Structures are given as C-alpha cells and as structure tokens.
Regions:
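Small/aliphatic-rich secondary-structure junction motif
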Residues: 2-60, 160-224, 240-244, 283
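Intrinsically disordered, low-complexity Ser/Thr-rich linker and spacer segments
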Residues: 151-163
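A short acidic, glycine-rich active-site loop
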Residues: 61-71
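Generic hydrophobic alpha-helical segments
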Residues: 30, 97-101, 183, 233
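Phosphate/nucleotide-donor binding subsite
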Residues: 70-94
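Charged docking surfaces used in two-component/phosphorelay signaling
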Residues: 91-100, 224-230
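Gly/Ser-rich helix-loop-strand patches that form or flank binding pockets
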Residues: 1-3, 9, 102-154, 235-283
Length: 283
C-alpha cells in the first residue's frame, strides 16, 4: 500500500485466524478498525480441526458488538449491515495456511491485514512454512501484527481504544514517510488525546524531508541512538510504554514471508505493543 493508499479510507480488512484464545485480541482490533472505517471484514478460518459446519459461529461478531454497546441484544445481520459493516467468513482452501492467505490476497486484494503474533515466534503458530518468494514479494499489503500477550490499543471487552503513545522507527532506506502518514491517520481515527508520536533514529537520519502532520493534541518528539536499531526500537517501546509501533518494511521483507532475522521480524518477536507494518513503495 502506498502512502496515498494508506491515507485513503480503508474499505477491506482481512483477518486470518485459528480462533484460539491467543487470537481474540487481534480479532478485537480487526473488528474495531472495520467498524471505524465502515469496511468489509473478511475473516479466514485457518484451523482444519474445526468442523466445516461450525466455523461460521466464530468469532462471534454480533455478541461482541453487543458487549461493546454498539448493537442491542438479539440483533440481526441487518443491524450489522446498518452499521456500514460487512462481514465475510471463509475457510482456508489450501492445506497450508500461508498458501491459502496468498491465494486469497491474490484473488481479493485488501487494504489492511490483521494478524495475531506470538512472543518468541514472531508469527502465528500456523505461519511457519515459507511461501514461494516471488509470490510473497508481490503481496504489498499493510499489516497490523497484534501480539497475543498484550492488550493492544483496543479493549477486547469494551471496544474502547487507548492510543496515547506511538513509536515510529525512522530511516532513509526504506523511506519513512508512509509510516508517518499512517501514524497520523491512526492517531486521527483512534487516538485518545493527548498523543505523543516519537521518532526513533537508529543513527543520524535526516528528517528534514519528512512531512509531520500536525494537531493541537499531538506532540512530536525525537530519539537518537547508535548501534543495533532493533535494540533501540524495542528499548524505546518498553521505556515509553508505547501503544503501537508504526514502521515501513522493505519490499523483500514481505509481510507474508518476512526474512528470518530481518529488522521487522526481530521487532515482532520482542515488541510489547502491536506493530503496524507499511510496505515500502515499489520503485
């Protein structure tokens, strides 16, 4: 997704899930974002152990929206549609979950993907095997990675957001403007003022070329460090207890086939907050 695309209204959100307990926080984020954007939310069921006749019952969209106070008790599918929210539930058609995701995204491009991640693994349990590199490199899709061991910025029980502190790793390669644009939009839509947006420079990067969106309730700050950029990013995230990390990933660091040991994956392994990864513009 380009910076211009990210700035546009999100119309399609894709959420692959195994419906495990660990996936519930990611589902809450996917549903809240779909609700805010009045978007179509496609939920792909990737657990082959659940019977076909039972998969449509989970996750429970209407009960969740009722719990959040968005829908009344005993609401109908029409009530969901009246919110401007579209819900599609599909099963993975390939035995390998990664292949199923790639097939789906190839046939039905999305504006945002929401994935649960697991500490020390970086990926959901069902995303272990690599996908053919040429295919994964073409999957230019912004992805919100939500660690299963944190609450994130959407309260699973109430649907309320808590987005006060945002961290943006800055670099010249890839350029960081798409991350800045995405962070500004996220702060506008879901932020809870006052909001602090911190730029982390793992080096002496020049930000003169960056356009920082302004808002009376936002404060932009900067941190500079030398050495391992991942260590600086994770340390800053922990010290400031950030609610989300927003960063640009290189084209070859595809969100579906992140290179083992890449900066993005190492951040996913150690992050204590959701990570919004924006693919670098293709040249």
């Amino acid at each position: 997704m380009t910076a211009a695309d990210q700035a546009a209204t999100i119309q399609r959100i894709f959420h692959p899930t195994d419906f495990s307990e660990d996936s519930h926080v990611a589902f809450a984020h996917a549903l809240k974002l779909a609700l805010i954007h009045r978007a179509e939310l496609t939920i792909m069921h990737v657990d082959p152990t659940v019977a076909p006749e039972g998969f449509e019952d989970f996750p429970r969209v209407r009960p969740t929206l009722t719990q959040w106070g968005v829908l009344p008790e005993n609401s109908s599918k029409a009530d969901v549609a009246n919110l401007g929210l579209g819900i599609r539930k599909i099963r993975a058609l390939a035995a390998d979950a990664k292949q199923a995701i790639v097939h789906h995204l190839t046939a039905s491009p999305t504006d945002l993907m929401v994935l649960a991640t697991h500490q020390h693994e970086g990926f959901a349990r069902w995303l272990h095997h690599p996908v053919a590199e040429p295919v994964s490199r073409e999957m230019q899709v912004a992805t919100l990675f939500v660690p299963s061991h944190v609450g994130g910025f959407v309260d699973r029980a109430t649907g309320k957001t808590s987005l006060h502190r945002m961290l943006l790793p800055i670099s010249t390669d890839p350029p960081s403007q798409p991350a800045v644009d995405a962070a500004g939009k996220l702060a506008t839509q879901l932020g809870t003022p006052p909001i602090t947006l911190t730029l982390v420079h793992a080096g002496e990067e020049d930000i003169d070329g960056l356009h920082l969106p302004q808002n009376d309730s936002w404060t932009w700050t900067q941190l500079f460090g030398k050495g391992d950029p991942v260590e600086w990013i994770l340390a800053a995230g922990a010290e400031f207890d950030v609610d989300v990390i927003v960063m640009v990933t290189k084209g070859q660091d595809s969100v579906l086939d992140l290179l083992r040991g890449s900066t993005t994956e190492r951040i996913l392994r150690g992050a204590r907050a959701p990570v919004l990864a924006i693919p670098a513009p293709q040249v």
